[in-house]
Amino acid sequence: MNYTSVNKIRLWVLIVFLILYNIKCICENISDLKKRLCFNNFSNSKKKIKKKWLAKKKKNYLTIWKNKTYTTKRRNGYGKIEYKREENKKDDYNFMNTSLYLNYISNVKNFLFNKNNNKKNKIYYHKCKKSNIIEAKINDNDTLLSDEEFRNDVDRNDKEYYNIKKEYSENVCNQNRINDLSNCSVSSNNNILNECSSEVKKEMNYPLHNELYDNLNDNTIGHLKSEKCKEKYIRNFCILAHIDSGKSTLADRFLELTNTIKKKRMQEQFLDMMCLEREKGITIKLKAVRMHYNNYVFNLIDTPGHFDFYHEVKRSLNVCEGAILLIDGGKGIQSQTLNIFFELKKHDIKIIPVINKIDLSTCLYDKIKDDLINKFNFKENEILKISAKYGKNVKMLFQRIISDIPPPINTINSFFRGVVFDSFFDQYKGVVLIIKVLNGELRKKTEIFFINSAKSYIIQEVGYLVPEMKPTDVISQGDIAYVCSNIRNCDDIQISETIVNKDIIKKNNHNEFVINFKKINLGRDKNIMQRLSDEGKQYLTHHNKGEIKGDENGQVKCDENGQVKCDENGQVKCDENGQVKCDENGQVKCDENGQVKCDENGQVKCDENGQVKCDENGQVKCDENGQVKCDENGQVKCDENGQVKCDENGQVKCDKNKGEIKSFQYNEVKVDERYERNKEEIIYDHEHKKEGIFNIHKNDDLIKENIKEKENFSCSIQGNDNAIPILKKTDINIKSIAANKIEASYPSVYCNIYCVNDKKSNELEMSLNKLKLNDSSFSFKKYICETLGKGFKCGFNGLLHLNIIQERIKREYNIDTIVTAPSVNYLIRVKEKYMDKRLKEKLLEKNFDIQNMHIEQMDKTSSDDCFFFMTSNVNDIPTKNVVHSIYEPYVKTNIITPEIYQKYIMNECFKRRGIFIKKEIMNDQIIFLFEMPLSEILINFLDQIKSSTKGYGSMSYENIIIYKPSELYKIHIYINKKKIDSLSFLAHKRNYEDKSRKLVSKLKTLINPHQFLIIIQAALESKIFVSEKIKPLKKNVTAKCYGGDITRRRKLIEKQNEGKKKMFEIGKVKLPPNIFTKLFDIKSE
C-alpha cells in the first residue's frame, strides 16, 4: 500500500467522523429547540422548527473547525434578547437556575389556562427515578393527575408532551440551588423544608404568585440545600483493623468507586503517601479524605493497624460517628481486633463488621462469622463479606454506611466551634490543622481563638482533603477539613485544641476570657441564662442528641411504676436540640412518690455531659406536689442525707428583697472546697448590677469589705444555717465550651537521640518539633550526656515507632543521628535518711505523686522516711544502700495463636517472666492473657511469637501500666576503664549475667580494632564479672631487620609497646553511630 492510498483512507475516516458529529449536533439542536419554544410562548410552528435547527446545524458545522470564543444571541426566560460571550459552546439549557425554572412554570400556567386560547394544551409532570428528568403534568383543572390518568393522556396527546431535562450538579447544590425531587424523601421535617424554601424565595429574581409558590413548596421544590439539610448527607467514619487486613486496599476501592481519584493517577495503597509506608507495607499516619457518593459526602479516615500507632485510632474515633471493623478472612480475629472492639464500645459509636478477602481459597468466612456472633454479639444480618482487592460487595457496604451510620449531630448554636485532631507542617502555609467542625461555619479572613493556648489567628485558607488540599470558601458543621493560619510556632498547637470565633470572646474585669452573649445567635433558645449551669456546659459545650418533648404542659410523664425507661445504655435520648421541655414554672413533675428512678450509676443522662445526679439511693426526693425548685444556677444543693429541706410549702425561698444579703457572719457559713481551690477570693462583676458572684474564702476583711454593696449580690438559697450562698456567675469562662479532650497517649519506651554532627543540633531540635506536631504521641526534652554531648530524651510508643522517627529524621531533614538503648520508666522508692545533701537536692526535684498510680504489693510500713521518683535513665538511680525498692512496669498482653502452638507461646512468656492470668478458646484458636514486663516485650517478643506460630500468632498490649516490685540490678559497661552511661541498663536477678555476657560479646564484634588495646567490662555496682579484649592493630616494625643481633629486634618491639601504652591512656575509642540499634536488636535499614 503506497503513501497516497493511506492518506485517502485517513481522509475518508475523517469525513465519517464529521458526518457523525453533525448528526449529534442536529439531535441536540432539536431538543434545544423544544426548550426554546417552551420559553417563547410555546410556538409549535414546524416551519420555524426547520429554519432554526437548519441554521443551528450550519452554525455548528462551521464552528467545529475552531475552538475560539464567540458571541451568541438568544432570548432569556423573560423574552428579552441578550448577548452572551462563551467558550466551548455547550447546551445552554442543561441546567436551569431557580428563577428561570419557576418562571417557566408560571409561564406554563398562564399559557395553559388563558381563556383566549381555544386550544387546550397539557403539560405533564412526572418524576423519573432512573434518569434525572422532570416532566410536568397538569390537567385542565390545575391539579396533578394520577399515574393511570397520566398514562392515558400520554397516549392521546403525544405531540403535546414536553420534557425538561435538569441535570443534578453537586456544585450547584452547594450554592443552595434546587435539587432533584427524588431527594425530597430524605427530609421529614416540614419546618426545615419551609426554612429552606424561604431561602430559595429570597434568592429568586422574578416575583412569584403566592398560590404558585405554595404549590411548588409541596410538590416541586423537594429537598432544598441549607445547612440543616446538608448535615444529613454527611457520614464520618473510619476503617479499623489489625495490621495487614486490607484497610488501605479497601480505601483504594472507595476512592475508585466514588471517582475521587482518576484512573490515570490511581495506584495501590494510594493513601499511604510516605515512602516509609510503602517500603514497610504498613500505615503509619491516619489519612482523612472527602468523597462523594449519590449526593452523600463520605469523610473517610484510614488508620494504622500496628499497636505502636494505636493513638492514631483513638484520635479518629473522637471525630467519627461510625466505624468499619475489618477482619482478615484468611487469619480470622486477631489480638488488635479485640482491642479495637473494646475501644469502640467505650466511644459508643456504630460498628459495621466486615469480613475481607473472601476471594481467597483459604477464607474462613463461616468460622469468623460464628466468632463475631458469639464473641462480639453481632447479628448475622449485620455482618458483610467483601473482597477489597476486586471490589466485590463494596457498593453494598456503601449502602450500609448510609443507612447505619448516623449523620453528625445537629446543634442550634450558630457560632463556630471546631476540634483539632491532627496537624502537620507545610513549608509555605505553616502549621496546617485538620479539624472537625462541631457547629457553625468558618470562612476565610475570619479571626479564630484557641481556647487552651488563649491565642488568636486569622484564617488564611480553609478547604477539604480530597486527598490533596482543595481550598474552598466556607466549611460548615459536620465537615472534616483543614485550616491554614500561617502559624510558624509549633508549640502553639495542641491536639484536641478547641477553636472558636474571636467575636464571641471578651475579657472581663478580672482579665479572664469569657463568652460574649451579645455576639452569639441563640436560635430558638432565648432563655440561655436559665439553662446554663455555673460552668455553662449544659447548653454550650457539646453537640446534643435532641429534645424530649413533653405533653401540652411541657411535662414528661412517668409510667405506672414512676419510672422513666431508658435504653440499653441507661440513657434517655433527646431530639436534635438536646432539650427537655418543662412547663412555665420550669419544673418536671414526678410520680406520686415524688421520685425519679435512675440507672445503676444514679444518673439520668441526656447528652454527653447533661447529667442529673442523685443521692446514694439513686432518687431525687420532691415535695408534696412532686416538684423540685432550683436556684438561679439550675442546681439543688442537698444535705448529708442527699435531700433538700423545704419549708411548709415545699419550696426553698429567699427573702422578700429578691435574695439580698442583709447580714453576714463568717462563722455561720461552711467553706465549699470547690471555691477554696480557686485562687480568686472574691469575684465582683461591675457590668451586671443585678447579678454577681462571690466565693467564700478565709479572708474575713475581704468578705466584710465587699459584702457591704448588697445590691450587687443575690441569694440562691437562704434560711438554713448550713447553706452556702452561691450566686450564678454571669460571665461564663470560655473554657467551659471546650470540646472533650482526646485521651493523651503516654510513651512507653524512652531513649536518647544525639546528632552525629554537633553543628546540626539546632536543626535536629527544629525537626523534632515538626515531627511532634504531626505525631502527638511523640515527646522529647533536652538532655546532655558527658560522652555523646547535647541531645534529646525522647518518648515513643514502641520500638517500631522509634525506628520510624529515626528514619523520618534522616530522610525528611537529612540529619544523621545516634540512638541510645531503649528503656522504660521505673518507679524508685528511696530511703531519705541514707541520702547525703547533694543527692537529696537532686532527687527532690523528681519527687513523684503515686496516688493515681496502680502499684501492687506495696509495703505497709510507714513511708514518712521514703519518697518516690520515676526515671527511665539508669544513671539517675542511686546506690543500693539508698534504694528501698524498684518497681517495674507490667502491662496486660493479649496473645492469639492456633491451638497447636500454645506450648511454644507459654514457654516464651514464662521465659520472659510473664504472669499467666487466663485463656479463652475460640474455635481452634486460643486467646492468652498475660501480665508481662514492659521491658521484656519490647525487644523481639513479637518476632519470636511470629516465628513460633509460623506467622499465625499476634500480640497486642494495653496502655494501662501496673507497677510491681522486682529484684533488678543496675549493670554498668566500662570501655578502657571508663564508664559509658548510655550503655548502662537494668536487668533482673534471674538473667542479668546472661544478658551482660551477650552484650559484651556483641560490643566486641561491633567496635573496630584500634591501635591500642580495648578492654570491655560489665560490672554490678563495683564488681566486674564479665570482661572481653579487642587486640590492637600492629605494625611489623622488625620487617626491616634482615639479620644481626636479636637485641635490635627487642628494642623495636619494646618501643612499639611503650607507644601502645601511652595511646591506651590518652586514646579515645570511637563507637560506630548505629552501634546502639544493632546492639539491642532494633532493625535499621
Curated annotation (Swiss-Prot):
Broadest EC class assigned to this enzyme: hydrolase
Top-rank lineage group of the source organism: Eukaryota
Domain tr-type G: 232-409
Catalytic reaction equation(s): GTP + H2O = GDP + phosphate + H(+)
SUPFAM superfamilies membership: EF-G C-terminal domain-like, P-loop containing nucleoside triphosphate hydrolases, Translation proteins
Membrane topology, from the record: Peripheral membrane protein
A molecular-function term among this protein's GO annotations: GTPase activity
Keyword set includes Membrane: yes
Positions annotated to bind GTP: 241-248, 302-306, 356-359
UniProt EC number: 3.6.5.-
Major place of residence: mitochondrion
UniProt keyword annotation of Transit peptide present: yes
Gene Ontology CC: one annotated term: mitochondrial inner membrane
NCBIfam families recorded: small_GTP
Its job: Promotes mitochondrial protein synthesis. May act as a fidelity factor of the translation reaction, by catalyzing a one-codon backward translocation of tRNAs on improperly translocated ribosomes. Binds to mitochondrial ribosomes in a GTP-dependent manner.
Similarity comment: family membership: Belongs to the TRAFAC class translation factor GTPase superfamily. Classic translation factor GTPase family. LepA subfamily.
Protein known as: Translation factor GUF1 homolog, mitochondrial
